């Protein structure tokens, strides 16, 4: 069961119960796996956070991933508290780059701008982080051109 990927305590407990083991046997087996070092929610939470950051996910996505894996609250809080703002910033920058490559006209067309923002929000970044990142990268204005009230180049319908 643990051969394919690391599992949380709750995942192991659920799988054993689904296979029909008695709760006392399940509890004893979970305790044995923890003592043997084969079951560690803190290590799992750290690894899951690193994995999510590598693919450009933000803090909210990390929290959601840890909940899906049913990692204990203490282990999740510890792993999240160890996150470096710089590492999270790198993940955000990568996600911004991906989003702007995917939607090349995002600076000029309101719908494309909304798509970029939705993409980044779906990856777990907060709106404040997005505004700051887009502003720092000079991507909140279309190439420094004059813009109308909607932020579009003059004359764009």
Can you describe what each PLM-predicted range is?
Residues 1-157:
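An alpha-helical, amphipathic repeat domain used for nucleic-acid recognition
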């Amino acid at each position: 069961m643990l051969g394919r990927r690391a599992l949380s305590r709750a995942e192991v407990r659920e799988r054993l119960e689904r296979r029909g083991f008695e709760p006392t046997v399940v509890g004893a087996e979970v305790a044995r796996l923890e003592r043997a070092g084969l079951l560690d929610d803190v290590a799992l939470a750290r690894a899951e956070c690193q994995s999510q950051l590598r693919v450009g996910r933000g803090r909210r996505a990390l929290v959601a991933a840890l909940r899906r894996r049913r990692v204990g609250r203490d282990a999740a809080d510890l792993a999240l508290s160890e996150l470096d703002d710089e590492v999270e910033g790198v993940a955000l920058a990568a996600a911004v780059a991906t989003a702007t490559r995917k939607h090349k006209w995002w600076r000029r067309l309101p719908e494309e701008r909304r798509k970029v923002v939705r993409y980044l929000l779906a990856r777990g970044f907060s709106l404040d982080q997005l505004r700051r990142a887009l502003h720092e990268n000079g991507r909140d204005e279309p190439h420094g051109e004059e813009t109308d009230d909607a932020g579009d180049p003059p004359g764009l319908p």
